[in-house]
Design a protein with these regions (language model features):
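Beta-rich carbohydrate-recognition modules and glycan-binding surfaces
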Residues: 55-56, 60-253
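Lipid interaction determinants
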Residues: 1-6, 10-76, 225
Length: 253
């Protein structure tokens, strides 16, 4: 690259030409760009590619001081799902889960959960099976609304004794666990959202009966970056499969 570049403006043709064969962004074999529009907020340019026949490129430039990320509001919005209706209000995303129908008949319709339908969670041999729900357009206001509650059922027929493969030497647990974890994450971080997560694990849960659990995230009530709830049964990092059930999910005060 050159130490510096200049440009020439043709007001009649409404074009802008860069010096020294310079180009904006994607190389299109030209240094001349047509000015489509110019305002105080944005400059729009275009060019016909000379190296990709039939292609045309558009460019948008805005003042540096205006190139800021939009502010994402923080809201206290309650979430609840009992899985009884055909259209779910909280429809969990399934990651590396099994193929069994996830809305399932209650395996034990007795107190404390006599409802007709529940959620069947089928952990596969994948190391990081999980389900998650991400809200759109806002982040969680955890000031008061910081409790996740659900009813869970841990079947005894799962194989909790055998040793299974793990994701690596750093994984110390290689058996299926009678547990459930709930995590709050920042979805903006994508595949690295676990790096800033807050996780609560309920371990060594009693089997073959419905249990009412509460996950209290009041310790991170000042966080403003979370917008994703992850639920994970049986532990992670190992290939042990298992089936679990939960119902009456809520995120509230």
């Amino acid at each position: 690259p050159q130490a510096e570049y200049t440009f020439a403006l043709d007001e009649n043709e409404k074009t802008l030409t860069l010096s020294n064969d310079a180009f904006f962004g994607h190389y299109a074999g030209t240094s001349t760009y047509k000015i489509e529009s110019l305002t105080d907020d944005a400059l729009y340019l275009s060019c016909a590619s000379k190296v990709e026949s039939g292609n045309k490129w558009w460019y948008r430039f805005i003042p540096k001081e205006k190139n800021v990320k939009p502010v994402v509001p923080v809201k206290a919005v309650a979430l609840a799902e009992n899985f009884e209706k055909e259209k779910l209000s909280v429809d969990f995303k399934r990651e590396e889960m099994g193929t069994l129908q996830h809305i399932y008949a209650n395996p034990a319709p007795v107190p404390v959960n006599e409802s007709k339908l529940v959620y069947l969670y089928q952990k596969t041999s994948a190391f990081y099976s999980n389900i998650s729900y991400t809200v759109t357009g806002y982040k969680f206001d955890l000031t008061e609304m910081n409790k996740v509650r659900m009813k869970v059922y841990i079947p005894s027929y799962n194989n909790y004794e055998d040793v299974f493969a793990t994701a690596g030497d750093w994984v110390t647990i290689n058996k299926l666990q009678s547990q459930v974890a709930v995590k709050l994450q920042n979805s903006n971080l994508g595949t690295t959202s676990y790096t800033t997560q807050t996780e609560i694990v309920k371990a060594n849960l009693q089997k073959d009966r419905w249990l009412e659990l509460e996950f209290d995230f009041s310790s991170v009530k000042d966080r403003k970056d979370y917008d994703k709830i992850v639920i994970q049964f049986g532990g992670e990092g190992h290939a042990a499969p298992g089936i679990f059930f939960f119902d009456d999910f809520s995120f509230n005060k």
